Amino acid sequence: MSDRYEIVLTCPKGLEGLLLEEARALGLEEAREQTAAVRGQAELEVAYRLCLWSRLANRVLLVLSRFSMNNAEELYEGVKAVDWRDHLEPAGSLAVEFSGHGSGIDNSHFGALKVKDAIVDRLRTAGGERPSIDKINPDLRVHLRLDRGEAVLSLDLSGHSLHQRGYRLQQGAAPLKENLAAAVLIRAGWPRIAAEGGALADPMCGVGTFLIEAALMAADVAPNLKRERWGFSNWLGHVPAIWKKLHAEAEQRAAAGLARPPLWIRGYEADPRLIQPGRNNVERAGLSDWVKIYQGELGSFEPRPDQNQKGLVISNPPYGERLGDEASLLYLYQNLGERLRQACLGWEAAVFTGAPELGKRMGLRSHKQYSFWNGALACKLLLIKVQTEQFVTGERRTRTEDEPVAEASSQARLSEGGQMFANRLQKNLKQLGKWARREGVECYRLYDADMPEYALAVDLYRDWVHVQEYAAPRSVDPDKAQARLLDALAAIPQALGVAQSRVAIKRRERQTGTKQYQRQAAQGQFMEVSEGGVKLLVNLTDYLDTGLFLDHRPLRLRIQREAAGKRFLNLFCYTATATVHAAKGGARSTTSVDLSKTYLDWARRNLSLNGFSDKHRLEQGDVMAWLAEDRGEYDLIFIDPPTFSNSKRMEGVFDVQRDHVELLDLAMARLAGGGVLYFSNNFRKFQLDESLVARYQVEEISAQTLDPDFARNPKIHRAWRFTAR
């Protein structure tokens, strides 16, 4: 047999260039790229070294023969022409893998059968002994690739794919193969950074694949050092002495590398279910001194190496089915960019994504991009130097083509009533604007039917205006009511200096049946606002309510102040804005319950927007039924029920006046010792049942829960503080 072989290394598509460099460095000669492969010449020692040291290859194939074929019979004869007695005992086991088609072979299973038949027929003894088939752990794994009439017949020296290092026995929902992770690290410059003593952090590490591959590189550990069974283990051409020498050298290098002071390599994962599997993987890889994995939210990611060294932040954010809808992903990418800008100045960053358009939302400019394939999914690796000159932040607002210039420059003359309304808006803006700026309030009620003939609520949401028209009583002439509304709408842009396109108008009236949940429109326009250090989503167009009850702002801020270390329960949670405040305040856990899937999806996006994960429970269900079955204990409870609620998903109708005693008794049964329950509602005729005051310590705090923008309308809601007697 020849001492020199043709070797083919297979790899994921997109890794060919990197694999070519690696293979040459490991001794492959005459190496050249092919699609998803590298081909070259090597002696057996180099082939073994490629098996042991390649971080990028899937398989190491030793080519036995190349031959032309036009039909199945020529395939059979070409395979049978190889002297298989040099490779396998007649009593040995065999597996055949066949790829490609053509020349009369249009079915890979049929092609594999012809290859198997040829080998078996060549090795069958006079006594009838012949190789058996073992698809799992054969003595010899044979590979035949058919490409445009040429058959390439090879032995698979690797056995199982080389990406299976043996440490990742537990994985998350969207695993990244080890050799692809290694390729991403190499492209990101990790070998250079590691050689300089740099750090590495992954804010969404899953079960730690990036971390482990990075540590293996930094510690000079052969990626397949711990593999016990190889494709060549029972091959008759195997030379154990050569393999033992190479394996011993690799063990010595690993021992020396692991004996060095470990680099700072840390991973953070929000999902508590992945922490122990990740740590188990690290332990199996023998890297417990090098790699540490902690539970941590993206929103609090801040790498702090022990010697203040900089390094590489690497991440494979979710980009498809594993983490919900595109909106949540958008906020996750925005949050990642925010954490990089705020906590990682001077670092390098590498973001591997199957959704490059989301990568553009991070507010950071990438200096280099590489194309990869993760299976069948085209991906990009974005390389970023986290320096201020690479930041893409701040609002850049220009007039759109369909927005007339006149909207900003020309003002129509107002009617007398319209001018009075405008004057009132400007007066309120002057008074409330000072308060809002001082308190950092972005969204507040500017006007609330201050002038009875203009029965509107006008709310400011940053540079948008949300207008709710209260339905006029039947005694008012509809034409006059319509005229006043038009006067007011004409006055609002002029008085407040906003474009008409940024005024959203709705009619508010008593909601009946399921109408309370129905969409008013379907524009799907969400905007982000800030309140008390958290970010919240509002929708000014699609629903009657915007997703943020402005009158409850003081209660939400109170909850944030009181939430540290507490178990928080939010009933009738709506879009869970109070839950976001509780999470921001350091709540140990949060549970939010609502009947509406729409609002719970909104709640999930609010949490995602702030970097909070699914550890914050969102429960869809009828609150009364849920409370009756729940056995949890909570330190802080917030209940803000609707006046009434009616849905196909619940039994009967909820009426706050009729049902509040049962509701509060159920909730107080879940309150831990020393806990506090806040109860509020907007029913203006509501009367708290006196029996509750007898059973519990009850304090009305309505006046304390009104900010200046609602002080002129003290009946907007009532609120109580409940504790156990």
Curated annotation (Swiss-Prot):
Keywords: Cytoplasm, Methyltransferase, RNA-binding, rRNA processing, S-adenosyl-L-methionine, Transferase
Organism (species): Ectopseudomonas mendocina (strain ymp)
Family: Belongs to the methyltransferase superfamily. RlmKL family.
InterPro entries: 23SrRNA_methyltr_KL, DNA_methylase_N6_adenine_CS, RlmKL-like_Mtase, RlmL_1st, SAM-dep_methyl-trfase, SAM-dependent_MTases_sf, THUMP_dom
PANTHER family per UniProt: RIBOSOMAL RNA LARGE SUBUNIT METHYLTRANSFERASE K/L, RIBOSOMAL RNA LARGE SUBUNIT METHYLTRANSFERASE K_L
Reactions listed under catalytic activity: guanosine(2445) in 23S rRNA + S-adenosyl-L-methionine = N(2)-methylguanosine(2445) in 23S rRNA + S-adenosyl-L-homocysteine + H(+); guanosine(2069) in 23S rRNA + S-adenosyl-L-methionine = N(2)-methylguanosine(2069) in 23S rRNA + S-adenosyl-L-homocysteine + H(+)
Molecular function via GO: 23S rRNA (guanine(2445)-N(2))-methyltransferase activity; RNA binding; rRNA (guanine-N7-)-methyltransferase activity
Name under which the protein is recorded: Ribosomal RNA large subunit methyltransferase K/L
